[in-house]
Amino acid sequence: MELAACQELHPRDNFQTGSSSIQLAMATLVFDIETSALPIDHFDEVQQEYLFRDANKLPDPVARHARKGELEMQMNLYPFTARVVCIAMLNADSQRGQVLFIADDYDEKEENEAAPVQFVPCMDEGELLSAFWEVAPKYDSIVTFNGRGFDVPFIYLRSALLNVPITRKDWLGYRYQTAPHCDLAEQLTFYCVSGRDGAARRFNLDFYCKAFGIESPKAHGVSGMDVNRLMAAGQFREIADYCLRDVQATVSLYQIWKERLGGIK
């Protein structure tokens, strides 16, 4: 896959010169992933029994069917039952970047090579993850929303399952610091200082965005719950657009956090 556009993500050529030294800019990558459940027939009979054991215990067939549907929806959340279908990445300062997305059929000629964000179709998940891990070492730090609890462990485990080399293994280190990983879901709750019901209880990204006057990534009528449906319908670009809106909102939220709350101990 062509990765020339990846180089535009890296800002190390934007340095300031002093009287006696050169200070390189700190490179910060903001990213988000979208996941889609693997088909049920991907799992053997024993695995399916394990996955739906909770539903199969229910005596009422209607309740059992409903519970099975709920469990199928939850499969998107786990790297052993789902795959990464999109990763959107932006440089926190320049807001240039890439959106890597799985697409069976996509016309790259539609893309504007001069655009600040390049949409890069990938044939499969392995190609997508390989492209991501080629970009990752170019950055000193990352910013996510709930990345410590979801995005990072998910891509670590999917990469391991597909034997894709992981180039940054320090994103799940010491929790109570913002480098190299600033997780805004942790920062805006002060590391869950007040639990689920206190003043710093956690809200979702949509709620935080609206509270701070940022356009919600869900404003266009698409959410993460739609990814399975969009994949089945071949609407790959719609997934990529939504994932990018998530990252753009995260960048805006990060800027507000850094200016107004950064440094609170």
Pin down the residues of each PLM region.
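Conserved RNase H-like, two-metal-ion catalytic cores of nucleic-acid enzymes
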Residues: 21-127, 134
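Metal-dependent phosphoesterase core characteristic of DEDDh/y 3'-5' exonuclease domains
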Residues: 27, 82-120, 133-241, 245-249, ...
